[in-house]
């Protein structure tokens, strides 16, 4: 599409801010769409895009107290109260009216819904979006990162009517995009809906530049000895990330090393973080829960200390751990390759199905950490030539399969279909 025919596109989600996978991947879509001449606007409960392009509604956030109260009655239970049903519909009405105002304010011609019709983190928002699309026939794209049936905490629920209607809805003006082939197959099996596969990407045609010096003091700021290895766990602290295996790896390496975790405890509670803290003490491993020192962009804490970017973290790391059991795609995998680091990772299903056949060289772990994994990790840490060989091989594969060029061509096709062109 030429810039003369650019469209006004509205992104909708519970949160479009920070370092979570949905927000980061949405930002890549925005970058490509903007380069294609389109104007992007944002509706969410939390948003860190320019003020003149956002419409922020607190009730759209999954952490809003009213939404949290609803979640507690809708999930991990078999029945819900009539009060909950009434509150869902009351909030649905409020959110739908705000969505209408968002569309009118910015003249939105296409909506891209980022996971808000995929996983029921905010049921009233999903129902509101569904009704709005049914009432307006506005072209829309559902960008699905993960579905409710993929998460154990949504298996038991009292929300069947909402899930069938809105997570995701099946509407003639809504096109579905999935990030892995298994999700597309399961979506078709459950709903009969077709989907388009657009995997996550990074800008592999423009590799990261040489560090500019800002992060030269990263180790000293975190009280890590210059001779210690920095092992990086660049994920949220949730059980499916299996961070205890990263702790075990550091213990068994028999090398001076510190494990740095860059993200906060996720939306599944703090008990897992407490478990990891206790486990690290038992294993005598230094683990830094350093979320307050890392963000998507560089900044300063309220007391003036440096906040480093995720890019800084990757570039100063010696090895990345990613022992997840389940991922929708695996942003940390792509980021590790982009910043030219070796990776120890879990062989989660999507990696085995969609990614591994392309020939990547990783240290793959199964249900337990085996001695072979320890030997391989120690080798890449102590043999620079081996490390360089692996990271260059992986980078070239990502340039071929997961670059911005791939995303650009697919988005052009998707938008042409959405507008009937």
Predicted feature residues:
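A conserved catalytic-core segment of Leloir-type glycosyltransferases
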Residues: 4-6, 32-35, 41-110, 294-295
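Nucleotide-activated donor-binding/catalytic signature segment of Leloir-type glycosyltransferases, i.e.
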Residues: 270-312, 359-361
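Aromatic "clamp/platform" in nucleotide-sugar-dependent glycosyltransferases that forms part
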Residues: 325
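Donor nucleotide-sugar binding/catalytic pocket of nucleotide-sugar-dependent glycosyltransferases
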Residues: 149, 162-217
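A charged, aromatic-enriched C-terminal amphipathic alpha-helix characteristic of glycosyltransferases
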Residues: 382-416
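Conserved donor-binding/catalytic core segment of Leloir-type glycosyltransferases
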Residues: 11, 219-220, 224-241, 247-250, ...
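Short hydrophobic beta-strand element within catalytic cores of glycosyltransferases
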Residues: 342-346, 362-363
